[in-house]
Amino acid sequence: MKRAVAVATICCSLTFAVSACASSGDGSGSQTAGREAASPGGSAPQAGAAAKGVRLLRVGSFDEPTYLAAPPGDRARRFVTEREGRIVLLRKGRRSTFLDISSRVETGGESGLLSMAFHPGYRSNRRYFVYYVANDGALTIFQFRATAAGNATRKGSGRLVLRVPHPRFNHKGGQLQFGPDGMLYAGFGDGGGGGDPDRNAQDLGELLGKLVRIDPKPGGGYRIPRGNPFVGRSGARGEIFAYGLRNPYRFSFDRATGDLTIGDVGQDEVEEIDFLPAVSAASGPRGGTNLGWSVFEGNRRFGAGSAPAHVAPVIERTHDQGSCSITGGYVLRPRSYGALRGSYVYGDLCDSGLRVARLSSGGARGDRALGPSVPQLVSFGEDARGRVYAVSLEGGVLRLAPRG
């Protein structure tokens, strides 16, 4: 049966609408943003927590925030996406509206403005990308350009990159990230409904239920990289990088190694973290991996058919353990994290406690509770320094700071 994500709030909080029009708004108002302050969730970890390595510093409160990102090399700016279709810029203790596309964004079900990503050459080309769910339910990637100063979006700069029709209210995916190879990666859900009724995840002719890898063109649209694993295969979409995914809502690249880690939201019993090791830090992982859905849910057999050479997850969290919708995170890389440096931090929408583990192709070591809790944890984010943030749909954006 269909997992009751709506009860956990994500279904009614993560819907974004997109239209094919190319105009954009850049907003004008600005106001003072709160300075970072200790959050109650960070200063008072849950009793019995296995580690007390971080505290949570509140960056600010927002209207249903969904993600945090920063341009490469820019330590002065952080950007927060809000579900309704706005991007808020944080700079020098103040906030301003960087983009407002709320008229395009569907906000029911698991929709909304879900993430953003900055082009590796953003400092010179000012190109950035957003992932949202359009008013007709389509999964949409749009490109915009910032002004030369980088504090607003250029009016009329919007260009459609990719649009994928989606038939149902759930499993909308939502993540955008540029990999170490300079290509744009996006995670698309399987099309929704219980058990992948359309069998999209194992179908190489469909983009739903996939991780895709594309090279966005400056004027809109995209190229398919020649190195993608299914380029030239009859009946397969060349954009596909990995398949067999249910709802890859959050994924990230390790900024030190290039390894790719995917949080794939489960169905009835199992939430999973998938790990794709990098060939090199500069190239990222090799493509073509089958992650098993809907033949497998985690390591457990789920549906009919076969999943050739599928790769099992490195972490499983069951619903019996209090999980309901896993939220993939980031590998902690700044030296300031001390003993936690090199650990992967992740969480879950229902079980709000943060967790850490050391990941490799062989599995996970030391998977444990970190201590602080974040209610309605919908995302993690990373700034230009590699510092990691937790995002609560209740409004809080919190930086994970070393304790002591």
Q: Predicted segment positions?
A:
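Acidic/polar, solvent-exposed loop segments in beta-strand-rich repeat domains
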Residues: G194-E206, R223
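Conserved blade-ending motifs and adjacent loop-strand segments that build the rim/top face
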Residues: L245, G363-A384
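Short loop/turn segments immediately following beta-strands, especially the blade-tip
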Residues: F144-T153, V212-Y222, L276-G287, A357-G363, ...
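Repeat-solenoid scaffold signature
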Residues: S234-E272, P277-A281
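C-terminal motif of bacterial Sec signal peptides marking the signal peptidase cleavage site
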Residues: V18-A20
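Bacterial N-terminal signal peptides that target proteins for export
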Residues: M1-C11
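Acidic, Gly/Ser/Thr-rich repeat motifs that build Ca2+-stabilized beta-propeller blades
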Residues: A4, A22-G195, R250-F253, T257-V270, ...
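Surface-exposed loop and turn segments in beta-propeller and other repeat-based domains
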Residues: S96-S111, G156-G173, L207, P216-F241, ...
